[in-house]
Amino acid sequence: MAKLTKQAFVEALKEMSLLEIKELVDGLKEEFGIDPSAVAVAAGPAAAAEVEEKTEFNVVLKSFGDKKIEVIKVTREVTGLGLVEAKKLVETADAVIKENAKKDEAEALKAKFEAAGAVVEIV
């Protein structure tokens, strides 16, 4: 028996009807013992994990830039901290300003801090 090339196989498939292709697939499943439910179960959770979207974010102050006083004012306004606590927080490297914020709240905080001259990251 001559070896069938991939290209010849594809050309042969192009000439088949959908019913013939279905019968071919069913025959291959039977010949090689392929269980379609096992394939679907294995692929199911991975597909669900890809769709899952993060809903809570942390707003992290990376740098106060050259407007430290403005950033301290915004920090006090957002967190409700006193002057000394807000100053310490601003001076801390990678300080978390807000934890578990919703996406739109985190974006609003980022915009507010950036307007004051800070470098902020949402993680």
Curated annotation (Swiss-Prot):
Keywords: Ribonucleoprotein, Ribosomal protein
GO terms under biological process: translation
Disulfide bond sites: none
Keyword Acyltransferase: no
Key word Ribosomal protein present: yes
Domain of life: Bacteria
GO molecular function, one term: mRNA binding
CDD domains found in the cross-reference section: Ribosomal_L7_L12 (cd00387)
Classification via Pfam families: Ribosomal_L12, Ribosomal_L12_N
Family membership: Belongs to the bacterial ribosomal protein bL12 family.
Protein's job: Forms part of the ribosomal stalk which helps the ribosome interact with GTP-bound translation factors. Is thus essential for accurate translation.
Subunit composition and interactions: Homodimer. Part of the ribosomal stalk of the 50S ribosomal subunit. Forms a multimeric L10(L12)X complex, where L10 forms an elongated spine to which 2 to 4 L12 dimers bind in a sequential fashion. Binds GTP-bound translation factors.
Name assigned to this protein: Large ribosomal subunit protein bL12
